[in-house]
């Protein structure tokens, strides 16, 4: 007889515990009900990126001295620098510079360690394409400045997101 009573008590304790867990989940759900939505309508609304956002790399061909510091500090040896030694002036002449953004991890080491500041990070983050080979940018594509989303009248920019209270 006693085993049946203890089983009934265990069943009651499990029921109370399950009801408590469901109630806690319901309270958490209700606390989130009065918050503003965090999502945005992406193609028509875009967030203004922060000042230190690491987007596509911008390259200035005239400033580059082909020192290859960017290649040495890159964790995956990504930038491809082709240069030719000019014997009459004893300097390197840059021929080609390219970065494959399909492989790039956007760590920013190349920008940080560049001695001539010919590399900089932009706020451009829309790099998606249908073919991987289109992500390999040469010096001409890297030299393009991104279009600012603030100047585009078809896109509504969202400056401040609602603060999330934890």
From Swiss-Prot:
What compartments host this protein? Plastid, Chloroplast thylakoid membrane
Q: What are its GO cellular component terms? A: chloroplast thylakoid membrane
Q: What is its EC number?
A: 7.1.1.-
Report the main location listed first in the record.
plastid
InterPro entries the record matches:
4Fe4S_Fe-S-bd, 4Fe4S_Fe_S_CS, NADH_quinone_OxRdtase_chainI, NDHI
The top EC class, named as a word, is translocase
One Pfam entry name: Fer4
GO BP field: photosynthesis, light reaction
The entry lists its GO molecular-function terms as:
4 iron, 4 sulfur cluster binding; iron ion binding; NADH dehydrogenase (ubiquinone) activity; quinone binding
Cofactor(s) recorded in Swiss-Prot or TrEMBL: [4Fe-4S] cluster
Q: Which UniProt keywords apply?
A: 4Fe-4S, Chloroplast, Iron, Iron-sulfur, Membrane, Metal-binding, NAD, NADP, Plastid, Plastoquinone, Quinone, Repeat, Thylakoid, Translocase
Catalyzed reactions per annotation: a plastoquinone + NADH + (n+1) H(+)(in) = a plastoquinol + NAD(+) + n H(+)(out); a plastoquinone + NADPH + (n+1) H(+)(in) = a plastoquinol + NADP(+) + n H(+)(out)
Where on this chain does [4Fe-4S] cluster 2 bind? Answer: 74, 104, 107, 110
What is the annotated quaternary arrangement, including any partners? NDH is composed of at least 16 different subunits, 5 of which are encoded in the nucleus.
Homology family? Belongs to the complex I 23 kDa subunit family.
Which purpose does this protein serve, as stated in its record?
NDH shuttles electrons from NAD(P)H:plastoquinone, via FMN and iron-sulfur (Fe-S) centers, to quinones in the photosynthetic chain and possibly in a chloroplast respiratory chain. The immediate electron acceptor for the enzyme in this species is believed to be plastoquinone. Couples the redox reaction to proton translocation, and thus conserves the redox energy in a proton gradient.
Task: Report what the protein is called.
Answer: NAD(P)H-quinone oxidoreductase subunit I, chloroplastic
Originating organism = Hofmeisteria fasciculata
Q: Which gene encodes it?
A: ndhI
